[in-house]
């Protein structure tokens, strides 16, 4: 019998958070009961430590807060919540938002442009998200805005900027970089062959190593059946870093469902 941490005494039911309902999204149904219980414990601590700030009239209720916290904690389920140190606020727009972007080109000219963003992650600042794309992160499609931005935070723990190489033993860095760049090249080749819209992996992964790590982290957790067979060596490195194997988890869940179905009388 699993003792769920959110199941409280009868007198406290009014203040209990809806963790069981929050866990019902497709992305989290493959987790075992033990993993779900551990994830909820982390998410409870996350909500105690971080401030969720709704912007532009967005309404944040307890169910939305719980689901946001669960998705933040999924990548650090085995790493620990301390891996999410370094920020204290999560800003949430109702929809993708416009920002002023500034960059310097190869000859030193500075350009300014207003662009639409789904999310942002600053090394020593808040994470910025939007609810429309958070909702689209609930399924197992390969897209997950929260995991993408969390991956950037994990990436920057290794240095001053996101490099695509998280905090791993130094002896593993060269192999990680080799496999990551090989994946980027493979994704770029597919894009050139079939176009961005028809590519099986989000084309953004080919833009630079940091984005490749973030995008493939999305696929690692929400579409492992696409990631693992295509980049098996890099997949093993991700499993070792995150200390999770979502593909094995998916197969186990499917096997359990099949067994339950065949034993229904």
Curated annotation (Swiss-Prot):
Is Transport among the key words of this record? Answer: no
Q: Which residues bind Zn(2+)?
A: 111, 148, 152, 211
Listed Pfam families: Peptidase_M90
> Gene3D superfamilies, alphabetically?
Collagenase (Catalytic Domain), Glucose-regulated metallo-peptidase M90, N-terminal domain
* GO biological processes: proteolysis
Please give the cofactor(s) recorded in the UniProt entry for this protein: Zn(2+)
Recorded GO molecular functions are: aminopeptidase activity; metallopeptidase activity; zinc ion binding
- List the keywords (alphabetical): Aminopeptidase, Cytoplasm, Hydrolase, Metal-binding, Metalloprotease, Protease, Zinc
Specify the superkingdom. Bacteria
Q: Where in the cell is it found?
A: Cytoplasm
| Note describing how the cofactor binds | Binds 1 zinc ion per subunit.
* One Gene Ontology cellular component annotation held by this UniProt entry: cytosol
Q: Which CDD domains match?
A: Peptidase_M90_mtfA (cd20169)
Which InterPro entries does this entry report, sorted A to Z?
A: MetalloPept_cat_dom_sf, MtfA_enterob, MtfA_fam, MtfA_N
UniProt-listed Enzyme Commission number(s): 3.4.11.-
Family, per entry: Belongs to the MtfA family.
Oligomeric state and partners? Interacts with Mlc.
HAMAP family documented for this protein: MtfA
- Primary role: Involved in the modulation of the activity of the glucose-phosphotransferase system (glucose-PTS). Interacts with the transcriptional repressor Mlc, preventing its interaction with DNA and leading to the modulation of expression of genes regulated by Mlc, including ptsG, which encodes the PTS system glucose-specific EIICB component.
The name this protein carries in UniProt is Mlc titration factor A
Record the organism.
Escherichia coli O17:K52:H18 (strain UMN026 / ExPEC)
């Amino acid at each position: 019998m699993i003792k769920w941490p959110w199941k409280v005494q009868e007198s406290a039911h009014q203040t209990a958070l809806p963790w069981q309902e929050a866990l019902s999204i497709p992305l989290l149904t493959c987790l075992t009961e033990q993993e779900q219980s551990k994830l909820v414990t982390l998410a409870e601590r996350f909500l105690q430590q971080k401030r969720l700030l709704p912007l532009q009239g967005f309404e944040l209720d307890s169910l939305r807060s719980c689901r946001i916290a669960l998705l933040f904690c999924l990548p650090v389920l085995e790493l620990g919540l301390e891996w999410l140190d370094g920020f204290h606020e999560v800003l949430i727009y109702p929809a993708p938002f416009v920002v002023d972007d500034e960059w310097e080109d190869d000859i030193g000219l500075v350009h300014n442009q207003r662009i639409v963003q789904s999310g942002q992650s600053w090394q020593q600042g808040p994470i910025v998200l939007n609810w429309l794309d958070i909702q689209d992160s609930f399924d197992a499609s390969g897209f997950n805005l929260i995991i993408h931005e969390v991956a950037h935070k994990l990436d920057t723990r290794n240095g001053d900027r996101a490099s695509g190489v998280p905090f791993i033993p130094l002896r593993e860095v060269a192999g990680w970089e080799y496999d990551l760049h090989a994946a980027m090249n493979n994704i770029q080749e597919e894009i050139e062959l079939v176009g961005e819209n028809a590519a099986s992996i989000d084309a953004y992964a080919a833009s630079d190593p940091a984005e490749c790590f973030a995008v493939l982290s999305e696929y690692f957790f929400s579409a492992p059946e696409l990631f693992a067979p295509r980049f098996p060596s890099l997949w093993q490195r991700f499993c070792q870093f995150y200390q999770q194997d979502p593909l094995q988890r998916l197969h186990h869940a499917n096997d359990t469902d099949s067994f339950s179905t065949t034993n229904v009388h």
